[in-house]
Amino acid sequence: DTSAAALAVLRENAARAGASNIRAVQDDLFFMRPKVRYDAMVFCFFGQTGETLRAVRAQCAGRAFLIKRGHAEHRFSLTNSPASRLNFQRACAELTALKVPFFTETFSAEMGQPLRSLPDAERFFAQFGTSGHPPDTAQIQARLTKTGMPEFPYFLPAKRMLGMIVLDARDIPDSI
């Protein structure tokens, strides 16, 4: 990752869990070359298929796990706006076309957003919504659930389908 703050949280959580086999690296993934290839790599909502495969081929000696969105709509829009990012189905089609063997698993996960107040919810939809219209307060309130927690009294649920692609770095052709 390139975020020092995010990596500090990861390091802290790994230390607290006693996970000595996790190493957080702050670098540019596409240019770094480890002295020893990683046993495994995990890419969660990260990268286009070709660039991910090139990074795996250069840096990994074992399996790579690619977590991709399995849904086609933007999760924080008040309308059913299509998501613009690459998704699970497209990544599988690209791997098949490249003749890279893989297996998959699909699952659902809650990917919602906690919110501190109704005005925060309105700002959130204004910033991340894709409809191009000002957010409608009644529509927003209809989508929120109350949590009973003082710090985040509202939650915008967003249960989404995800897909995990598992492949072996040794199966990635040099031509990619």
Pin down the residues of each PLM region.
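Conserved SAM/SAH-binding beta-strand->alpha-helix loop
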Residues: 3-5
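Short alpha-helix
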Residues: 84-99, 103-105
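Conserved Class I S-adenosyl-L-methionine
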Residues: 105-176
